[in-house]
């Protein structure tokens, strides 16, 4: 074979190999395309597009080694359509209270980045429930937690996180600078109310969907303050109560009607010989019921009920099962303030059912320890101390604190009634536990059910002191 023939032969072989390789590559591409079509042909692409991918990252140093923890969750999409929460349903009939959430924030905070907080409360939209809380601008087990027993400081802020989660910098949303606060959802957006400033000139800042819409200046220059629990929204209007004046004498109390963050009406209560602070409010059949704290002279709780025009009625829970702390032993009640052990108090709540009332209270008469729910079938109007049901949720030996009401609207639950719920603050640290340099709390919550429940204790459970305290 001469050289020219060799060149032609080698070229032909190379061309043949190239053609075969090209055919194989084309076949491979066709095979992949067909396989992909078979796998995806019957799937609902809309469902995939409606998913939300949420990635949480936490970076820290462990024994001089850098650790990055990444947790990716694929969450099925929710219908986020806005709607006006009607608020015109009656309270659901219930037989007791089922545990709903527990955040264990103090226990987790011994080794994790958890905010120092107090005054937690819960509020729900038609899509979710969130825990709101007042931070101290500090983390547990850190030097800035020192002295956080103080109620009012420029470092405090209203923040929120998903219910049941320990409040941390990684899951919390800033809401407002505040040392007293409230928040609620009208079905279209969050209304937040944050009070901050000096005792003799504090200002309440109203925000709607995060934008400042209104301010309210202290009118008595004596520590303007609000609910420390959720406000109430009915048919697009939201309602809150504020107090200004002495904590141990006659003060001034105003109800505000707010629409999309703007005040449309306000009135001052004509309530001589009554004291209203830190009201726990809920909607019921289109009206608003608030059960409050008398820090002046009542060991039973005052109430105010009003409609959307702010026409109101006032009174005190008549039952001889007293709801405040401190308080006397149960006995003869009154529809006026019960003056025995009536000074001071603690934020609390009750739910009215006709002439009956569910009363939430500490188990101790004199300190913020333990918690129980009591059903008095005639307690709203009668003064005896007879009751039918008592459900324990925190043992007498464990610390409790503030408590308050919140509701779940039918738009959230799918029920045809308003589900009553409550939360309990579990305070730890100072002033009672003097081995610590800080004051903070965790929280638990319960919702009313018309089925079986249980007596038990769900305490905070943290072992003190922490490293920073030693």
Curated annotation (Swiss-Prot):
Reported function: Catalyzes the removal of terminal sialic acid residues from viral and cellular glycoconjugates. Cleaves off the terminal sialic acids on the glycosylated HA during virus budding to facilitate virus release. Additionally helps virus spread through the circulation by further removing sialic acids from the cell surface. These cleavages prevent self-aggregation and ensure the efficient spread of the progeny virus from cell to cell. Otherwise, infection would be limited to one round of replication.
Region of interest (Hypervariable stalk region), ranges: 36-90
Residues the entry annotates as binding substrate: 118, 152, 277-278, 293, 368
Comment text on domains: Intact N-terminus is essential for virion morphogenesis. Possesses two apical sorting signals, one in the ectodomain, which is likely to be a glycan, and the other in the transmembrane domain. The transmembrane domain also plays a role in lipid raft association.
Region feature Head of neuraminidase, mapped onto this chain: 91-470
Listed SUPFAM superfamilies: Sialidases
Glycosylation site positions: 44, 58, 63, 68, 88, 146, 235, 285, 365, 455
Active-site annotation: 151 (proton donor/acceptor), 402 (nucleophile)
Family per record: Belongs to the glycosyl hydrolase 34 family.
Regulation: Inhibited by the neuraminidase inhibitors zanamivir (Relenza) and oseltamivir (Tamiflu). These drugs interfere with the release of progeny virus from infected cells and are effective against all influenza strains. Resistance to neuraminidase inhibitors is quite rare.
Virion surface-side positions: 28-470
Record topological domains on the Intravirion side: 1-6
Main location: virion
Record region (Involved in apical transport and lipid raft association): 11-33
Organism this protein belongs to: Influenza A virus (strain A/Kiev/59/1979 H1N1)
Annotated keywords: Calcium, Disulfide bond, Glycoprotein, Glycosidase, Host cell membrane, Host membrane, Hydrolase, Membrane, Metal-binding, Signal-anchor, Transmembrane, Transmembrane helix, Virion
Additional information: The influenza A genome consist of 8 RNA segments. Genetic variation of hemagglutinin and/or neuraminidase genes results in the emergence of new influenza strains. The mechanism of variation can be the result of point mutations or the result of genetic reassortment between segments of two different strains.
Cofactor (UniProt): Ca(2+)
Xref: InterPro entries: Glyco_hydro_34 (IPR001860), Sialidase_Influenza_A/B (IPR033654), Sialidase_sf (IPR036278)
Catalytic activity: Hydrolysis of alpha-(2->3)-, alpha-(2->6)-, alpha-(2->8)- glycosidic linkages of terminal sialic acid residues in oligosaccharides, glycoproteins, glycolipids, colominic acid and synthetic substrates
Entry EC number(s): 3.2.1.18
The protein's name: Neuraminidase
Transmembrane segments: 7-27
One BP annotation, GO: viral budding from plasma membrane
